[in-house]
Amino acid sequence: MDRLHIIGGSPLSGRIPVSGAKNSALKLMVACLLTDQPIEFTNMPNLADTRFLAQLLETLGVEVYWPRGSSTCHLNAAELKSTIAPYEQVRKMRASFNVLGPLVARSGHATVSLPGGCAIGARPVDLHLQALEAMGADLRVEQGYVKAAAIHGLKGAHINFSTVSVGATEHTMLAATLAKGETILENAAREPEIEDLAHCLNQMGAQITGAGTPIIRIKGVEALKGTTYSVMPDRIEAGTFAMAAAAAGGDVTLDGAPVAALGAMIAKLREAGVTVDADEAASTIRIRRNGTPLKAVSLSTQPHPGFPTDLQAQFMALMTLASGTSIIRETIFENRFMHAPELARLGADITVRGQEAVVKGVAQLTAAPVMATDLRASVSLVIAGLAAQGETVVNRIYHLDRGFERLEEKLGACGARIERRSGEEE
């Protein structure tokens, strides 16, 4: 099992290219099921999760051409040989569940296992299923599988989500592209990745308006066509590297960064005393901190355009070194402070009270062996390790590989002393 060895204390200096967005790529790949024509995706991130999904698509009959190391992925779902997504594959990653709607929209039926993925609270798929039912799908849940049928096709519906859900918004939008009539989504999520998906689907011939606002309208069409589409840059990866540079100190420029999508994070870094130069026209973000003490900043995670839950763990790692006390409130997912006890092993002073964490800044973190528990938690330990004194070992980094492309290479190119090793946990 791989692990990362990090010798902290080295400031970072250089440029880091931002990869394609995992959270966008996973939904874009599923869109191939809606057409019998080939699709080419560029700027596709090479991640464990995107590779898992490619394997599932192959099981369904999609032709996948995606050479190792390439950022261009070709998908052709001309002939689907199966509409069953088995537990063995769906359990590896929650986003696999999103094949359900497109399969029903195109084939009239599907059987898909309930999802797996990061162990972050309950994260139910009720909203997904309620939306499909509203569009006329007949659903049964049996032995861990959702069996769905819409023999005469899906029908447009007026759907008002009881809570804001990125996954349910995207899933319903995918299915509605081929439904008869108009589907209106109210209380829709507004994340940039939803806009990215809508842009791609519209390029394929869909009729979607309002993506990025709380009300999305989808006029169903008879068929979608193939296209070539570039995956948007990953705002979570960009934010992660920004916080790594702020924690370790130094001068790092992020190239190809989605500046407009990171307003909340940029504001919090500036509030914490970090110098941030963001250039939307050039798609660059420059992070500088040379000896300036960090200030404690409190925040609550919120749906976009608020502070993203997927950057909460990274920001907590940064706040462990700030002067003062910060309160971090998690409002999106339950049980998303699993990184707190591992950060405490490095000397952080964190008290978790339900959905709230109180972080009292310390003068110095000290290296220790730690264990990754989920994707974002794992990278928070890397950030802390870059700032800690001594050698930190991060075990179980398979979580990290699910969402970060060549992390150690990108950090290493900026002067981080970080190395991947194989073998037993330390």
Curated annotation (Swiss-Prot):
An example Pfam family from this entry, by short name, is EPSP_synthase
* Residues that coordinate or bind phosphoenolpyruvate: 22-23
Q: What top-level class of enzyme does the UniProt entry assign?
A: transferase
Q: What is the lineage of its organism?
A: Bacteria, Pseudomonadati, Pseudomonadota, Alphaproteobacteria, Hyphomonadales
> What Gene Ontology terms for biological process does this UniProt record contain?
cell division; cell wall organization; peptidoglycan biosynthetic process; regulation of cell shape; UDP-N-acetylgalactosamine biosynthetic process
Q: Which GO molecular function annotations are given, in alphabetical order? A: UDP-N-acetylglucosamine 1-carboxyvinyltransferase activity
List the record's Gene Ontology CC terms alphabetically: cytoplasm
2-(S-cysteinyl)pyruvic acid O-phosphothioketal: which positions carry it?
Answer: 118
The record lists UDP-N-acetyl-alpha-D-glucosamine as bound by: 94, 123-127, 310, 332
Q: Which HAMAP family match?
A: MurA (MF_00111)
Q: Which organism is it from?
A: Hyphomonas neptunium (strain ATCC 15444)
Compartment(s) of residence: Cytoplasm
Enzyme Commission number(s) from the entry: 2.5.1.7
Q: Which UniProt keywords apply?
A: Cell cycle, Cell division, Cell shape, Cell wall biogenesis/degradation, Cytoplasm, Peptidoglycan synthesis, Pyruvate, Transferase
Active site: residue positions: 118
What does the function comment of this entry state?
Cell wall formation. Adds enolpyruvyl to UDP-N-acetylglucosamine.
Pathway this chain belongs to:
Cell wall biogenesis; peptidoglycan biosynthesis
- Tell me what reaction this enzyme catalyses: phosphoenolpyruvate + UDP-N-acetyl-alpha-D-glucosamine = UDP-N-acetyl-3-O-(1-carboxyvinyl)-alpha-D-glucosamine + phosphate
Q: Does the keyword Cell division apply?
A: yes
Q: Please report which protein family the annotation says this sequence is part of.
A: Belongs to the EPSP synthase family. MurA subfamily.
Q: What protein name does the entry list?
A: UDP-N-acetylglucosamine 1-carboxyvinyltransferase
